[in-house]
A protein has these predicted regions:
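Negatively charged
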Residues: 1-244
Length: 244
């Protein structure tokens, strides 16, 4: 009824929708606690069949009324939320500009019907915030813009791992890197034909580790301007890029 009436949802209860039907979720109380990342069973995640589009602001899962303007998330907030949802064809809006560690960890991992990624406006990142976010999204053809200039350890690790339909990588404007920040970011993106410019001059340990591993359609790599290196910074960066 347009959000006028809300009822409590019991976990693991199936909701049946016909074509054109909609269902909305919002937090019963504002959530400030963090997930226990050591226990997968404590995560909340969707299990769906058919073809499902997720619309509007994902922050309604954390906030009762102010989700439209609330700009930050807690650690592990949306980890695994849509993992292996092969029926998901559209992602919800992710407006948050202040991220917490692991907040989007594995969020869309294995969403094989997802063709377009949501916008990611954050400019300051946290540890593992985007790690594995779109891993295995084999239908994803375009990556979102990634405007962040302040990054963190493993923030993009495995982000597009196995995205076999991705042809072009987004710009990566950060000039100061963090440990493992781009680790395996495009591993297995074998249709990727264009690599981003990498302007960083301050490197970190394993920062580019296996970044383009298996990108066999990549024919050109841009210059790497850093003059002072870090331990293992370029380790296996272009391994198995057979067309390079």
């Amino acid at each position: 009824d347009g959000g006028n009436t809300w009822v409590d949802y019991t976990l693991n209860t199936a909701i049946t929708l016909n074509i054109g039907d909609e269902v909305a979720f919002r937090a019963k109380a504002d959530r400030t606690s963090e997930q226990d990342y050591q226990d997968y069973n404590k995560y909340f995640y969707f299990n769906m069949t058919g073809k499902i589009e997720a619309w509007h602001n994902v922050m309604s899962m954390l906030r009762t009324n102010d989700f439209a303007t609330y700009g930050s998330v807690v650690k592990y907030a949306f980890s695994y939320l849509f993992k292996s949802c092969t029926s998901l064809t559209k992602a919800p809006v992710l407006p948050t500009t202040t991220l917490a560690s692991n907040c989007y960890y594995h969020m869309f991992d294995g969403c094989t019907s997802l063709t377009k990624a949501p916008e990611l406006p954050a400019t300051t990142l946290s540890v593992n915030c985007y790690a594995y976010m779109f891993s295995g999204c084999t239908s994803l053809t375009k990556a979102p813009e990634l405007p962040a200039t302040t990054i963190a350890s493993s923030c993009y690790a495995f982000m597009f791992n196995g995205c076999s339909s991705l042809t072009e990588a987004p710009e990566l404007p950060a000039t100061t890197l963090a440990n493992y920040c781009y680790q395996n970011m495009f591993n297995g993106c074998w249709k990727l034909t264009k690599a981003p410019v990498l302007p960083a001059t301050t490197l970190a340990t394993y920062c580019y580790y296996h970044m383009f591993d298996g990108c066999e359609s990549l024919t050109k790599a841009h210059g790497l301007p850093a003059t002072t290196l870090a331990d293992n910074c370029y380790d296996n960066m272009f391994v198995d890029c057979t067309s390079l």
